[in-house]
Curated annotation (Swiss-Prot):
Glycan attachment residues as annotated in the record: N479, N769, N986
Range of residues in the leader sequence: 1-21
Compositionally biased residues, Basic and acidic residues: 1535-1549
Family: Belongs to the VPS10-related sortilin family.
Gene3D superfamilies: 2.10.70.80, 2.120.10.10, 3.30.60.270, YVTN repeat-like/Quinoprotein amine dehydrogenase (2.130.10.10)
Polar residues composition-biased segments: 1489-1501
Protein name, per record: VPS10 homolog 2
Note: Present with 279 molecules/cell in log phase SD medium.
């Protein structure tokens, strides 16, 4: 039956002949082309132009005949018809040359003009901007491209001004090109239309040049811009001084205003934007918006009929492939253009896409559509149903009131799925895309849409509707959608469907109406067409000719153009006076203080108007009495929920009304007449008394601080920011399950509409910072991947929610695991168990992955070098059992399942490791570690006398290849403490860093690594741990700090005076008795609060006291350090909460556990503090937060106002942006850095971790930092030689009181052969020296405490080891024997010829120098005798020297005996042995002696047998001490190496 009715309707509309034009058929001319898609037409003419492959053709008879334009010789890239002279002038741009052609006579003649482009290119894409009045003034823009690597590469854009081609002048910025091209280059005439109020000098031109430089190392950008103005048609330009130090992103020129957008942060292209407004192009003012604006849809900015600016604001898409439109908000200014407020009809303050259309020819009329960003997934088709309804509305009073689009169509009422007589529930829903190019008419318009309640929008069900009363009521005209346009001011309507039927056939006919849509005729086309474009030949819609373009359905597509002419309809008859009727705009209501009436053709009149729209009669009758619709709120006021104008104290602070007032209050009228309103008799407006005593005065910095208050009936229990630089989005949840979303740091907050479903939990994705998941109480999960701008609703598996957190893949955003309960009618049922459900499509579908799983990790995405990228590990707890096992799989447990451990306590991942706690005998724990998912190694904890059973441990995180772990040694409730341990690089071997470190019953530890700085850790220790362990005393906590990753610890140095300038009670030189102590991690209300900030380098706040121990929290004060913990200052008495902003450029404190109305803030790194009153009544501030990166200038306070009834829970957003004069200047090249300088932290100018590091700090407190990644630009000045500070004790070694690493008594060092198991390719290993290098250290050379001694072969690699170190004995033996033979022959020859035949050795002492008794018969004899004499001489000298030395030694020994009575004192070696020797024996005693590692050589280089023991005992103690190179702070060698030391020192001398 329904099908029959639909067919009947189609027959009624399409097949009934037109009674008023029965014989008429429009004139249709077809043009075919294979090379051109579009054809250009001149206004109100039959002249068409098209470009073929090698020529340009023109037709003067609507396409019937074509001829080639001989003047145009090159291939044409594009045509542009002058929008102000569309009947005559057009431009044709050449593709391969900087050249274009101009016609001023509708194409009859053409003249060429060549652009003097400064750079060569292979392709040119140019366009032109013409002046609305001065015909000869042109602006030419050309984009240059060149061929590179068989593709086109963008070269840049050049802009020229010209006086009709007589001369060209290039417009360039002063800063020139950067990185090859300027990213933005644009110029426009200030006078954008003939009726523009701007441009007193019609030749004025505004130009913007902008360059965006990308910093690859940090991923950030630096923007630079220049906004220039010409008052002489482009001959000279001057920069607008107001924007000299700002980054101008874009501008827009309207009829009454020029809008300029400046970027708040030049180092963040996604930063918020300031909107500058001018109506004279000489002075600009910053417009006031409800919140900071980030993304403005510049192409959609327009002005309404009273000059108000309509400003569409959008979000930036995170996913370019998203099929959802960008979220948006529409702001409308006041009539001055300086205060913007959001459109006031959006349902439930929801987020969504808002489209606002304003037909300029209908005064006061707005159309608006809202598309919510909440989609529902039914697991079969994505986004199939929406939970939040769409809304489509119309306003005829400038947006003051809005109504639904009412459908009035009795004939078709059965075709709609709802009752159209009830428009509040059944109305026309549309997106108004079609209204953007709507032709002017007197209230006649067409639109595509559906009829419904907004709960579903199926694009396939769209139909076409018509209205004759400017959109108030609508009627169905076509059961399909397609292209449509109007002519003769709505008296001719053309329509062609996209598809001719439900089968999708290509349309072969178009439809037309000559009675304003009442009846329709049809025309059969010669060739079916895929329609692309249907337009009137006259831009204002007053013509009777149309152009239809598209493609054929042939295998080889042909471009088709139909020229359609209705000018002969009604026998060319023009309408007379009797053919017109009055039509009242806005249903006869007053609009802008006047009633408007059009004269339009009667619907059934048999004529055409044949007039331009501007010539259509419009009667304007001012209204006698002004009403509320003629007024708007004064600048200092805003409308409340009731529509009343109430004072806004932020706006009052921005205005100057209180500065001009001499009293404590000022009278201000809350309403002002809208600028340009026509009403005659003004309303009587009563002034409002505004108190000024709490308004900051002019010149006060408080005047620039902006505070926004929001009230809630229920307490906000959860809140968290998305960690991105795109904006300051956060999600909040109150105590009854209502979620709220803000995108501006809490300044504007909207409740998240879940259709009545309460939110029970919110989870953020730790790997993808824009994603969050909201769990509903009815089994739905709300997912967002764009920081809460849009949501998809997924139905959770049919399982009970167990409240277990999701587990996410680190590499796939849409992949996560949800845990639900099966057989859980009762949570206590023995059959109730958890099931892990896997989704890979963001929740659209879930599959059951593993039964009884309670915790899983995507292990393959966590490791740096995973054994399998798809590996998943799960903790499984079987039903009816308390035992938990660890299993793994590489195919999500489809076919592969491996049991890793049969029985575990639990496991977790941190920094590329997975650590498993496994139960051991005697109720102990053992930890196993893996960094690839395949091989697990038991973590070796150090032996220590205070470590008993391994009952509990806490993983504190990992960094730079080491795991920090707290091993509990005392687990008595309220008296928990343990040892702080640190692992080696593979996480398997731990050493003790500190004893008795405080923890609480929940396993949290007073341990915090200072963010952004290497190796600085703060802990609290139980100083009386022995007595606490014996239950004799309560815990006494002390705070310690390390600057070298735990190797050395010290107490915090206290400040000399407190915040009031008084000395502290204790003043001891011993830090053990007088130091600073801070309350730590175990006492925090929110574990996200930290001492430090990763962006405020070196800064830390803490609540504590100066003394010998930590006092209770309420007795403490607030302290600050700016040098990483080296020195501290008390900044406030009493405990305070703190927060960092602008990388530490703004520090904020608020009292804790006390009601207040003020905060304290500092802009000079804590040197001075100011108070700011942020509210009238005192509140208890529960928390103060800002973005996770601490880079924003907005802070959010959560407070509770006691005894104030409804709305007692409040948030305050405090914005400090305006207190800074400018943004700090930062030069990435390092050539200029006026606002920053490099310096070390505190007095640590030496080396730390083997290098000297300097950090950037701003030098001018008047500027803000913004998104400059300062931490990325810290620099290592140099690497340093290794010192003791670069080493820590190895496994089974402990740090003794003298600073050396000693082997634990009774234990041996770690088995060096273990590394052979980890690295199978190794063939050798080394024994431990007792020291290992700190992973953070980059030192080179110097002390080598970890120096390896003799290598050992790895098990099974003995042969390779021998081959590596073996010697080629054969070759060495041959050389050695050869040398021996030569020596033997020479010795024998000298003896035989020089000694034996001269009498032998018996004559040796008788020979004298110069004696001629030697036989010399020839030259050989003489050479031999010379050798003999030389040997004799050396022998005599040596003998004589030895005898003299022997005599002198005997004499000196005799003198000493006589003086000291032969008493024998201890030598240096024996002294060191007696006083400083170590207890351990054997090889590992070397680890106690630092001097043994000083040189590059090994012990084997020292020959012990060369030094006689008796000689050492007689050696002067004084001389040895003088020769010693051992530092005073370091012990000497043990007894077993005394001779080595003495020998080495003797050789040095």
């Amino acid at each position: 039956m329904a099908l029959f009715r639909a067919l009947y309707i189609i027959w009624v509309f399409l097949l009934i002949p037109l009674s008023n034009a029965e014989e008429f058929t429009p004139k249709v001319t077809r043009t075919l082309s294979r090379y051109v898609f579009d054809i250009v037409n001149f206004d109100d003419s039959n002249t068409l132009i098209r470009a073929e492959e090698d020529s340009v053709e023109i037709s003067f008879d609507a396409g019937e005949n074509w001829k080639t334009i001989d003047e145009i010789e090159e291939p044409i890239e594009s045509f542009v018809v002058d929008p102000f002279r569309g009947h005559d002038r057009a431009f044709a741009f050449v593709k391969t040359a900087p050249k274009f052609y101009v016609t001023d006579d509708q194409g009859k003649s053409w003249r060429p003009l060549t652009i003097p482009i400064s750079e060569k290119a292979s392709n040119y894409f140019c366009d032109v901007t013409t002046h609305p009045i001065k015909k000869k003034h042109l602006i030419i823009r050309c984009d240059l491209l060149t061929i590179k690597n068989s593709g086109l590469m963008y070269v840049g854009r050049e802009i020229y001004t010209t006086n009709d081609g007589v001369s060209f002048s290039q417009v360039k910025p002063s800063f020139g090109k950067i990185d090859g091209h300027i990213s933005t280059a644009r110029c426009d005439f200030i006078k954008s239309s003939e009726d523009s109020d701007l441009g007193g000098n019609d030749a004025s031109i505004l130009c913007l040049f902008r360059n965006t430089e990308y910093i690859e190392s940090t991923g950030s950008t630096i923007d630079k811009s220049e906004l220039i103005l010409s008052a002489d048609g482009g001959e000279t330009f001057k920069e607008l001084v107001q924007f000299k130090d700002k980054v101008v992103s874009r501008y827009e020129i309207l009829k009454h205003h020029v809008i300029v957008l400046t970027q708040d942060d030049m180092y963040n292209e996604m930063s918020s934007t300031n909107i500058w407004i001018s109506n004279d192009v000489s002075t600009f003012q910053v417009a006031r918006t409800p919140t900071k604006i980030r993304h403005v849809n510049m192409g959609q900015i327009h002005e309404d009929s009273i000059g108000r600016i309509v400003l569409p604001v959008s979000r930036e898409r995170d996913d370019e492939d998203s099929n959802q439109p960008g979220a948006a908000e529409v702001l409308i200014s006041d009539s001055e253009g300086l205060k913007f407020l959001p459109i006031n009809w959006i349902p439930n303050n929801q987020f969504g896409y808002i489209n606002v259309a304003y037909p300029g020819f209908l005064k006061g009329t707005f159309f608006g559509s809202f598309h919510p960003f909440i989609e529902y997934s039914d697991r079969k088709r994505k986004y199939s149903r929406q939970k939040v309804r769409e809304e489509t509305k119309v306003s005829v009073d400038n947006g003051l009131t809005w109504t639904n689009l009412k459908v009035v169509d009795r004939e078709n009422v059965d075709l709609f799925g709802c009752d159209v007589t009830k428009p509040e529930r059944c109305s026309l829903q549309t997106h108004f895309y079609d209204l953007r190019n709507l032709n002017p008419s007197a209230g006649i318009m067409m639109i595509s849409g559906i009829v419904g309640d907004g709960s579903a929008y199926n694009w396939k069900e769209e139909k076409t509707f018509i209205s004759r009363d400017s959109g108030l009521t609508w009627r169905l005209v076509h059961n399909s959608t397609g292209l449509y346009t109007t002519g003769d001011l709505g008296n001719i309507i053309m329509y062609i469907p996209y598809r001719s039927n439900e089968n999708g056939d290509v349309p072969s006919k178009f439809y037309y109406s000559l009675d304003q849509g009442k009846t329709w005729g049809e025309y059969d086309l010669i060739m079916p067409i895929y329609p692309y474009r249907l337009v009137s030949t006259i831009s204002d819609g007053s013509g009777s000719k149309f152009i239809l373009t598209g493609t054929s359905i042939t295998e080889d597509p042909i471009f088709i153009t139909y020229s359609i002419d209705f000018s002969a309809v009604f026998d060319y008859k023009s309408c007379e006076e009797g053919d017109f009727e009055d039509w009242n705009l806005a249903d006869g209501k007053c609009v802008n203080g006047a009633k408007y009436k059009y004269r339009r053709r009667k619907q059934d009149a048999q004529c055409l108007v044949k007039k331009a729209f501007k010539d259509l009669s419009l009667d304007e009758t001012p209204c006698n009495s002004c009403t509320g619709s003629d007024y708007e709120c004064s600048f200092e006021f805003v409308r409340d929920a009731k529509g009343d104008c109430i004072p806004d104290y932020n706006l009052i602070a921005l205005s100057d009304i209180c500065d001009k007032s001499k009293g404590k209050s000022v009278l201000v009228k809350p309403l002002q007449l809208i600028k340009g309103d026509k009403c005659k008799t003004p309303m009587k407006i009563e002034s409002v008394d505004i108190p000024c005593d709490e308004i900051p005065k002019e010149g006060s910095s408080d005047k620039e601080i902006v505070t926004t208050e929001n009230k809630f009936d229920f307490e906000i229990k959860f809140y968290q920011y998305f960690d991105t630089v795109a904006d300051e989005s956060l999600v909040m949840l109150n105590s009854i399950g209502d979620a709220y979303i803000s995108h501006d740091g809490g300044q504007t907050i909207k409740r998240f509409d879940t259709d009545g479903e309460k939110i029970v939990e919110i989870v953020f994705n730790p790997y993808f910072n824009s994603s969050a998941y909201l769990f509903g109480s009815k089994g739905n999960i709300f997912l967002t991947h764009d920081r809460g701008y849009s949501f998809m609703i997924a139905k959770l598996p049919e399982a009970r929610q167990l409240g277990m957190p999701l587990d996410f893949s680190a590499k796939a955003q849409d992949t996560f695991i949800y845990y639900g309960g099966k057989n859980c009618e009762s949570i206590l049922s023995p059959e109730c168990h958890a099931v892990a459900y896997l989704t890979k499509d963001g929740g659209e579908t879930f599959t059951e992955m593993l039964d009884n799983a309670i915790h899983c990790e995507f292990a393959g995405t966590l490791f740096k070098y995973p054994s399998n990228d798809d590996m998943v590990m799960c903790q499984v707890k079987e039903k009816f059992s308390q035992t938990r096992s660890l299993v793994s799989s590489t195919d999500f447990f489809q076919d592969d399942r491996k049991t890793v451990f049969e029985n575990i306590i639990g496991y977790l991942s941190t920094g590329g490791y997975i650590i498993v706690a496994v139960p051991h005998e005697d109720n102990e724990l053992r930890a196993y570690v893996t960094n690839d998912g395949a091989e697990f190694t038991e973590a070796k904890f150090p032996y220590d006398e205070d470590i008993g059973k391994q009952d509990a441990f806490t993983i504190l995180g990992s960094e730079e290849g080491s795991i920090f772990l707290h091993l509990a040694t005392n687990l008595e409730s309220g008296h928990d403490f343990g040892n702080l341990l640190k692992s080696n690089s593979n996480g398997t071997s731990f050493v003790t860093l500190e004893h008795a470190v405080n923890r609480n019953t929940f396993g949290y530890v007073d341990f915090e690594k200072v963010q952004g700085l290497e190796g600085i850790i703060i802990t609290n220790i139980v100083s009386n741990s022995e007595k606490v362990g014996e239950n004799k005393e309560d815990e006494q906590l002390k705070t310690k700090i390390t600057f070298n990753d735990g190797s050395d610890w010290n107490f915090l140095k206290p400040p000399k005076k407190d915040s009031e300038g008084k000395k502290f009670p204790c003043d001891s030189v011993s830090l053990d008795k007088c130091s600073l102590h801070l309350h730590g991690y175990t006492e925090r209300k929110d574990i996200r609060d930290t001492y430090s900030s990763g962006s405020a380098l070196g800064m830390m706040f803490g609540v504590g006291n100066v003394g010998d121990r930590l006092l209770p929290y309420e007795e403490c004060s607030t302290f600050l350090t700016t040098d990483g913990g080296e020195t501290w200052t008390e900044v406030k008495k009493g405990p305070h909460q703190w927060e960092y902003g602008d990388h530490g450029g703004v520090l904020v404190l608020v009292p804790e556990n006390a009601e207040t109305d003020s905060i304290s803030y500092s802009t000079d790194f804590g040197k001075t503090w100011k108070d700011y009153k942020f509210c009238g009544d005192k509140v208890l501030v529960k928390d103060i937060i800002t973005v996770p990166r601490d880079s924003a200038l907005r802070f959010l306070l959560f407070g509770e106002a006691k005894n104030m009834g409804s709305g007692s829970f409040r948030t305050y957003t405090i914005d400090f942006r305006n207190i800074f004069e400018r943004q700090c200047e930062f030069d990435i090249t390092g050539r200029k850095r006026a606002d920053f300088k490099y310096s070390p932290l505190g007095s640590r100018t030496g080396c730390l971790f083997g290098h000297k590091t300097e950090f950037l700090r701003k030098t001018d407190e008047k500027c803000f930092i913004g998104n400059i990644p300062l931490s990325e630009f810290s620099r290592n000045v140099k690497n340093c030689p290794c010192t003791r500070q670069d080493f820590e004790c190895d496994y089974n070694f402990y740090k003794a009181s003298d600073g050396t690493c000693k082997l634990v008594k009774g234990l041996s060092s770690a088995n060096g052969a273990d590394i052979c198991k980890k690295e199978p390719d190794l063939i050798e290993y080394y024994d431990s020296s007792g020291y290992r290098k700190i992973p953070l250290s980059t030192c080179k050379g110097g002390l080598k405490l970890d120096a390896h001694l003799a290598p050992h072969p790895c098990p099974g690699k003995e042969k390779a080891f021998r081959e590596k170190y073996s010697i080629n004995t054969g070759a060495y033996a041959l050389v050695f024997v050869t040398i021996l033979l030569v020596i033997f022959f020479v010795a024998w020859f000298v003896y035989d010829r020089g000694i034996r035949r001269n009498g032998g050795f018996s004559r040796f002492e008788e020979i004298r120098l110069g004696d001629d008794g030697l036989i010399e018969n020839n030259r050989t004899d003489r050479v031999v005798n010379i050798i003999v004499r030389l040997g004799l001489c050396i022998s005599l000298i040596t003998k004589s020297a030895f005898q003299r030395a022997k005599a002198g030694t005997a004499q000196l020994s005799s003198k000493f005996r006589a003086r000291f009575g032969n008493k024998k004192g201890a030598t240096y070696s024996s002294l060191l042995h007696d006083q400083l020797s170590d207890e351990p024996d054997g090889f590992h005693e070397d680890s106690n002696d630092l001097s043994s590692f000083r040189g590059q050589g090994s012990n084997s280089e020292i020959e012990q047998e060369d030094v006689d023991t008796s000689q050492q005992e007689h050696t002067s103690r004084t001389d040895l001490l003088g020769a010693s190179n051992i530092p005073d702070a370091l012990p000497a060698r043990s007894a077993s190496h005394e001779s080595d030391l003495a020998a080495a020192r003797s050789e040095d001398k």
